[in-house]
């Protein structure tokens, strides 16, 4: 390689997605097992017929549909659309943080935070989790005069936990008003047990709060890449200044609009997944696993030094799960038969290894 590249790239990790091994059960990427609803599939087919045309760069129809879906308090000018919420995370770093500035997050958390911060030349401040959950008090204590952006991944990926809703409000109120807080809610549709935060109210009533959501998880459009942000109009304008033109295809926009129109059917699927989450969690705990209560479409198994053995043995059993170094394993809740296969393996594994 003779071209001169930025030296910062030398220490930059390459994002490694969940493996896809033909013939195996994939429980590694937090995807829904359901395909598009018929109405969404039809919208996709109609949009494919005009892929010779550029998409609407402003996503006018999608923003209008989102505003209607989110409620009367949300206006289209308070919404930004991106090619998945991860690109909006990148845009947030771009509009807030320069070289030497600090971007804070709990850790372990969403892996993409680190590279997008490092590429910007900013400094990632990783605040350790407390009981697998974002430690908001510790994050407050870690704020400095260089802090520009704070990510709160809620539910947290990969540990599946949420922060207490009241604690989140207190945290937002305590953070200096010139620091942007990004509440990353990729898995918000799976939150139950009275733990759903009023994040939209936070974003609409405070100019330094932005909420990120996606169509990749509960809506099942991971392959089309559509995410959105809700925040103050000035913040949304700033996001639009750094967006890649035509990043959200017309197919993706059409599918997202159709999904919003069918949100009742899609949320019924989510209820079914939550029931499976409860079933699988209970069975794993009964078998001897320790895991935090999940509010996402996946479970976190904090296996520590046993992580590698679990992952390798799972692969031998044709199960693909997501390891995180020597910390633990993230397991997606799949279809009932897939979950049964996981339970059979996991129960056999723990019985064998804890003799």
From Swiss-Prot:
PROSITE patterns: AA_TRANSFER_CLASS_2. Keywords: Aminotransferase, Pyridoxal phosphate, Transferase. It catalyses: an aromatic L-alpha-amino acid + 2-oxoglutarate = an aromatic oxo-acid + L-glutamate. The keyword Transferase applies. It comes from the Bacteria. Its EC number is 2.6.1.57. Gene3D superfamilies: Aspartate Aminotransferase, domain 1, Type I PLP-dependent aspartate aminotransferase-like (Major domain). The modification N6-(pyridoxal phosphate)lysine is found at residue 217. Its cofactor is pyridoxal 5'-phosphate. Belongs to the class-II pyridoxal-phosphate-dependent aminotransferase family. Aminotransferase that catalyzes the conversion of aromatic amino acids and 2-oxoglutarate into corresponding aromatic oxo acids and L-glutamate. This is Aromatic amino acid aminotransferase.
């Amino acid at each position: 390689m003779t071209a001169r590249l930025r030296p910062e790239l030398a220490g930059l990790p390459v994002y490694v997605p969940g493996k896809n091994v033909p013939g195996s059960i994939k429980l590694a990427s937090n995807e829904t097992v359901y395909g598009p609803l018929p109405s969404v599939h039809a919208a996709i087919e109609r949009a494919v017929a005009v892929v010779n045309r550029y998409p609407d760069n402003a996503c006018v129809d999608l923003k209008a549909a989102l505003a209607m879906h989110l409620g009367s308090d949300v206006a289209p000018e308070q919404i930004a659309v991106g090619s998945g919420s991860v690109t909006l995370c990148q845009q947030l770093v771009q509009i807030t943080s320069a070289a030497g500035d600090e971007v804070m997050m709990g850790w372990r958390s969403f892996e993409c935070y680190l590279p997008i911060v490092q590429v910007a030349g900013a400094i990632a401040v990783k605040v350790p989790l407390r009981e697998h959950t974002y430690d908001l008090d510790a994050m407050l204590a870690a704020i400095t005069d260089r802090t520009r952006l704070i990510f709160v991944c809620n539910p947290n990926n990969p540990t599946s936990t949420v922060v207490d809703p009241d604690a989140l409000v207190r945290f937002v109120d305590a953070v200096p008003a010139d620091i942007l807080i990004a509440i990353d809610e990729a898995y918000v549709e799976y939150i139950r047990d009275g733990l759903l935060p009023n994040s939209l109210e936070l974003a609409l009533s405070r100019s330094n709060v932005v909420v990120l959501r996606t169509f990749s998880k509960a809506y099942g459009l991971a392959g089309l890449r559509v995410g959105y942000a809700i925040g103050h109009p000035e913040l949304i304008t700033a996001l639009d200044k750094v967006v890649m033109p035509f990043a959200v295809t017309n197919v993706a926009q059409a599918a997202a609009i159709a999904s919003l129109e069918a949100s009742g059917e899609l949320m019924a699927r989510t209820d079914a997944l939550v029931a499976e989450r409860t079933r699988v969690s209970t069975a794993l705990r009964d078998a001897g696993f320790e895991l935090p209560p999940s509010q996402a479409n996946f479970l976190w198994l904090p296996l520590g030094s046993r992580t590698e053995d679990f992952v390798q043995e799972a692969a031998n059993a044709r199960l693909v799960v997501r390891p995180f170094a020597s910390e633990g394993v993230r397991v997606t809740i799949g279809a009932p038969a897939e979950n049964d296969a996981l339970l059979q393996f996991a129960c056999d594994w723990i019985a064998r290894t804890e003799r």
